[in-house]
Amino acid sequence: MINKTYESIASAVEGITDGSTIMVGGFGTAGMPSELIDGLIATGARDLTIISNNAGNGEIGLAALLMAGSVRKVVCSFPRQSDSYVFDELYRAGKIELEVVPQGNLAERIAAAGSGIGAFFSPTGYGTLLAEGKETREIDGRMYVLEMPLHADFALIKAHKGDRWGNLTYRKAARNFGPIMAMAAKTAIAQVDQVVELGELDPEHIITPGIFVQRVVAVSGAAASSIAKAI
């Protein structure tokens, strides 16, 4: 019997080791898998490479992981904003590396990894510092930059509902990078508000099929509510 559900956050993040590359879902705090991140902090794993849309908000979720000193490098599209002071302080002190990737390229590089695409050409970033050291090519009179896929050892994502096969549905903006990150990682770990019985999820509403998800863990109602308030 296929059963991808885990009883606790701690068991769901077991096996994440020093030096892992981890994708973290979320657009700001929307869809941020805060409980999984807290579980990751508790493992004590260090020297992590984090791939995410931004570099943390306030002192929760991804920012808390940065505060714990667990991260060696961040790959993201939007590292600076009014509440990204944790990352800002670490970066200015030379304690963390940064790779900036334009948001469209970030999404496409993740999707390329999940789809088995070796590389792709994008016009975004041509002629800027972001294109330094990368192959360029003229196609139909326009210049493009060769972008490589982004793979990860693990993906931490947040979904609304899941079943024991790993099928997932999302709520509104919380969906964001979750589906493509699940495809691009060797092990996708999803925290959900509710685990439902097989057949309860309308196949037309399933965004991430279970084939792309290895672990599912339910977050308690109280914990989910506290995260929602933070969002």
Curated annotation (Swiss-Prot):
EC supergroup of this enzyme: transferase
Residues in coiled coil: none
An example Gene Ontology molecular-function term: 3-oxoadipate CoA-transferase activity
UniProt-listed Enzyme Commission number(s): 2.8.3.6
Any one GO biological process: beta-ketoadipate pathway
Any Pfam family hit: CoA_trans
Catalytic activity entry: 3-oxoadipate + succinyl-CoA = 3-oxoadipyl-CoA + succinate
PROSITE patterns in the record: COA_TRANSF_1
Binding residues for CoA: 25-31
InterPro entries reported in the protein's UniProt record: 3-oxoacid_CoA-transf_A, CoA_trans_fam_I, CoA_transf_BS, NagB/RpiA_transferase-like
Associated pathway: Aromatic compound metabolism; beta-ketoadipate pathway; acetyl-CoA and succinyl-CoA from 3-oxoadipate: step 1/2
SMART domains in the cross-refs: CoA_trans (SM00882)
UniProt entry keywords in alphabetical sequence: Aromatic hydrocarbons catabolism, Transferase
SUPFAM superfamilies, alphabetized: NagB/RpiA/CoA transferase-like
Family: Belongs to the 3-oxoacid CoA-transferase subunit A family.
Subunit annotation: Heterodimer.
Protein's UniProt name: 3-oxoadipate CoA-transferase subunit A
Originating species: Pseudomonas putida (Arthrobacter siderocapsulatus)
